[in-house]
Structures are given as C-alpha cells and as structure tokens.
UniProtKB/Swiss-Prot annotation:
Comment text on domains: The N-half (TM1-TM4) and C-half (TM5-TM8) domains are connected by an intracellular loop. Each domain is formed from four-helix bundles and they align in a pseudo twofold symmetry manner. The N-half domain is the substrate-heme O binding domain and the C-half domain is the cofactor heme B binding domain.
Protein source organism: Staphylococcus aureus (strain bovine RF122 / ET3-1)
Cofactors that this protein relies on: heme b
Disulfide bridge partners, by residue number: 37-44
Membrane topology: Multi-pass membrane protein
Protein name: Heme A synthase
An example Gene Ontology CC term for this record: plasma membrane
Length: 303
C-alpha cells in the first residue's frame, strides 16, 4: 500500500483531486450552493443522506465528498513520500504543509456552514486550499524528478530574480484573495463594464469597491509577472527551467486576464469562471516551484 512503486500515480491522482477541490469550491460559490446542506456539517440537513437532492445540495455534497477523498489521498501520498523519499530536504515540510492546510481549509469550510462567517473571512478559504494544492503539486514534481531536469539541478537564481519572484508570489496571493472576495461578496458583475465603466468611474457600493480592488490587483499581477518574465528570459537565456517556467507563468496570467474579462462580458458564464479558477491555481503552483528552486539557491549561498 505504501510501496515506492505507488509514488508516481499517487502524486498525479492527489494533484488532480486537489485541483477538483479548488474547482469545486469555486463552483459552490459561483452557484450559491454553500447552504445546500443547510447549517449542518458534516451531516447534510441533519442527516447522513438528505431526503431531497436539489442541485445546490448535490453540488455542496459533491464538494464535501471530493474534499474528504482528497484528504485521504494526500495522506496516502505524504506517508509514502515521507517513507521513501523523505531524505529529500523539501519532502517533509511540504508534507506537513499539504495536510495541515487541507485540514485548516476543511475547518474554515465547516465554520462557514455552521456559523455563517462574513465574506472577508470566507475569502480566505480558497487561498488556504491553494497552499495545500501547491504543496501537493511540488511533491509530485519532486517525485517525477522535474526539479532535476531541464538544467534545474544546476540552476542558481540570482537576487534580482529572487526578489521579483517573491514579489510575484505575494501579489498573486493578494489577487487570489480579492478574487475570492469578489465571489463571496456577490460582486462579480459590480462596477460596470470591463476594463472600466468609463461613463461612471466612481464606485457607488461596497461591491463596486470590491470589484475595483480586484481589477487593480489583477493589473498589478499582470504587470509584475510580465516584468519578471522579461527579466528571466533575458538573463537566463540558456536555462530551460527558467525559460519554460516563466513563459508558462506569463501565458497563464494572460489566460487569467482573458477569462476574467470574459466572465464579466458573459454575465459570469460558469465554464469561463471555472477556467478562471483553474488558471490561477496552476499559476500559483508554478510560482511555488520557482520559490523552491530559489530557496535551494539561498542554501547554496550559505554553504
């Protein structure tokens, strides 16, 4: 059960399941299904199996089921990884983070159901689960030795790119929070047209301010990633990890901006909104991979 031969498929399945957790959370919020099981948790309407199954109950129950299965799968993965490749420096801390933040995400989700938290607290939910996803994602990359391929093993990231990448990670995370707040505050269609309602630029409600803040953060995210991408490909032209990685990040942020704009233009089409959540999930995952490589460069400085 915990054999080394299981590591690769466990990593892939756990990463996919964590992706579905992210998308499921976005689906619950977008469809207003957070109260699909009433104020009961872990039961649904006070029962293990509810009497009726309206669509919001099905969506909420499905999200809970996927979250529970993902916890079991992540536990299986981290125990197996700890046992067989725990000698790799990053595996143990990543294992602790992945399980710890997944449990924290579940607790915040439960608190939201039972005590009806305010929007600003609920917006933390997506970001916390994103940290857990990224930890599982990194464990999977290590299992497949991606961190040793494409000149990654001999890569030394200098201070300018380190600073830009840290800034990129912080700004993305702030953008994630404001995006989650847009969903929870029911502000997806606030503040008029995209990119700005030029006929009336002054926000008139809390929802307008939430939406405007997210658009400003999205613009900053795009700008910082573009600057980081240009710096990376210009200064590391012969390193495929940097070239491919930061190019992928730049493509993902472009797709993120496009789906964000289309969400508004289509009155929040559900499929587009889910792609919007998917792209930011993998963009943040890519950024944490850069951070892992950067921390290795920092350790080499100290040796």
């Amino acid at each position: 059960m915990f054999g080394k031969k299981n590591l690769k498929w466990l990593g892939v399945v756990a990463t996919l399941m964590m992706t579905f957790v992210q998308l499921g959370g976005a689906l619950v919020t977008k469809t207003g299904s957070a109260d699909g099981c009433g104020s009961s948790w872990p039961l649904c309407h006070g029962a293990l199996i509810p009497e009726f199954f309206p669509i919001d109950t099905i969506i909420e129950l499905s999200h809970r089921a996927v979250s529970a299965l993902s916890l079991l799968m992540v536990l299986w993965l981290v125990i197996t990884a700890w046992k067989h490749i725990g000698y790799i420096k990053e595996i143990k801390p990543l294992s602790i983070i992945s399980v710890g933040f997944l449990l924290l995400q579940a607790l915040i989700g439960a608190a939201a159901v039972i005590w009806q938290q305010n929007d600003y607290v609920l917006a933390l939910h997506f970001g916390i689960s994103l940290i857990s996803f990224s930890s599982v994602f990194l464990i999977t990359l290590i299992i497949f030795s991606i961190d040793q391929k494409y000149e990654a093993a001999e890569l030394y990231i200098k201070k300018p790119l380190r600073r830009l990448t840290w800034l990129m990670a912080i700004i993305i995370y702030c953008g994630v929070y404001t995006g989650a707040l847009v969903r929870h505050a029911d502000a997806s269609l606030a503040y008029g047209g995209w990119p700005l309602p030029f006929h009336d630029l002054v926000p008139h409600s809390e929802q307008d301010w939430v939406q405007l803040t997210h658009r400003i953060m999205a613009f900053i995210v795009f700008t910082i990633i573009m600057i980081t991408y240009i710096h990376a490909v210009k200064n590391y032209p012969n390193n495929r990890t940097v070239h491919y990685g930061y190019t992928a990040a730049f493509i993902l942020v472009i797709l993120q901006v496009i789906t964000g704009a289309l969400s508004i233009m289509t009155n929040v089409n559900l499929i587009i909104a889910l792609f919007h959540a998917l792209f930011i999930t993998y963009l943040f995952g890519m950024t944490t991979y850069f951070i892992m490589l950067m921390l290795r460069s920092v350790r080499s400085d100290k040796q």
